[in-house]
Amino acid sequence: MVSSNTAVTQAQPSSSGFRWLQLVMGIVCMAMIANLQYGWTLFVDPIDGAHHWGRASIQFAFTIFVVTETWLVPVEAWFVDKYGPRIVIMFGGVMIALAWVLNSYADSLTVLYAAAVVGGIGAGSVYGTCVGNALKWFPDRRGLAAGATAAGFGAGAAITVVPIANMIASSGYQTAFFDFGIGQGLIVFLLAFFIQKPTVTLPPKKKQLNLPQTKIDFTPPQVLRSPIFWVMYLVFVMVASGGLMAAAQIAPIAHDYKIATTPVSLAGFQMAALTFAISLDRIFDGFGRPFFGWVSDNIGREHTMFIAFGTGALMLLTLSTWGHNPLVFVLATAVYFGVFGEIYSLFPATSGDTFGSKFATTNNGMLYTAKGTAALLVPAASIVAASYGWQAVFVIAVALNATAALMALFVIKPMRRAFIHGNEAAAAETAPGAKTA
């Protein structure tokens, strides 16, 4: 079960600065779509104040966006692998601009929901393309490249959240939607002209023995038929759902613990516990993605997963047991987000190592749909909390993270090596010139 194109062609020198330029442009594009997810919360109350649709109805647009952004990535990625990244990123730039322009004129929930679909398609086009392109340019540093690209998705919101909030306050949310929508979309559209895929397959460094990497480019149908893909998908869903269930409830938990407004002093700063925790969230999340990607490039994907998932379980257990202490709440939350965001660097890198570079965008896009699947499970946290309290939510999240950590070492690691070596041995036996019985 191998694709016909299995040859690895000698490429440009891996030290070439051109591929780093490609990475930087991808990160900037990711920063430009970040506000569609992380900046949305700034608009909810102003929209409700203008139209009185209710927070729940307005927030449903966000759910539509996440599902659309995630589940359509494999389709968009197929176009990338077939026609190249440029046209897909250009399309994404147009769509993200159109989405926020529609939001600026939305006078009904129908228009708001339609804009969420448009924005999801646009953001997914840019996200899947930039991560997939990074995997192709950096087979020797897939973890770092995927992590840095994914970090751009959070960094963009950190840079623009204050200007957006100021514009909403001074000119209204409609103006903020329109102006930032056009600006973000235009930057993505223009950068698309300069983004390209490698003209030849870049070979990974042979000396990295901790990183078993296939020499075969598996097609998407072949990937879907492989058990290792579905095991990776399951672990992705477990970590993402466990993390999202806890992360989505951080504010309610802080209020129920009666520490949300308690002052916390740390490193010369003093803020309310909840505000401090949320502020550190983006910093640690953004730093964690490239950091754990870099670590995985050096010690191996599964070993890094074990460390990250295990640390996540430990931090959730800490929150459950000692989270009533404001300082513990802030620190445990920060560390947790630092190890949670790495799923967006480790799984793309592992996918590229396992299934090859040629169809990396599509194959990683299929794996990325696990985020959408996990998002559908998040409302379960509210149901569990209402019936059994927050302790039960933490028990579930800890169990999911701990199980995922063990599966990374004792299931994914041996299965992935058997998959790579088995298929390469089969390809060698059937290759032209191979000895026959």
Where are these regions (language model features)?
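Hydrophobic core of transmembrane alpha-helices in multi-pass small-molecule transporters
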Residues: 31, 99, 110-124, 237, ...
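Conserved MFS/SLC helix-loop-helix module at the cytosolic interface between two early adjacent transmembrane helices
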Residues: 71-109, 296-302
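Helix-loop-helix hairpin linking two adjacent transmembrane segments in secondary transporters
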Residues: 153-199
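C-terminal transmembrane helical hairpin of 12-TM major facilitator-type secondary transporters
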Residues: 273-350
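Extracytoplasmic gate region of multi-pass secondary transporters
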Residues: 40-44, 224-292
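Interfacial helix-cap and linker-helix signal at transmembrane-aqueous boundaries
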Residues: 47-48, 79-80, 159-171, 254-255, ...
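Intracellular juxtamembrane helix-capping segments at the cytosolic ends
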Residues: 47, 125-138, 146, 342-355
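Flexible cytoplasmic inter-helical loops of multi-pass small-molecule transporters
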Residues: 197-217, 418-429
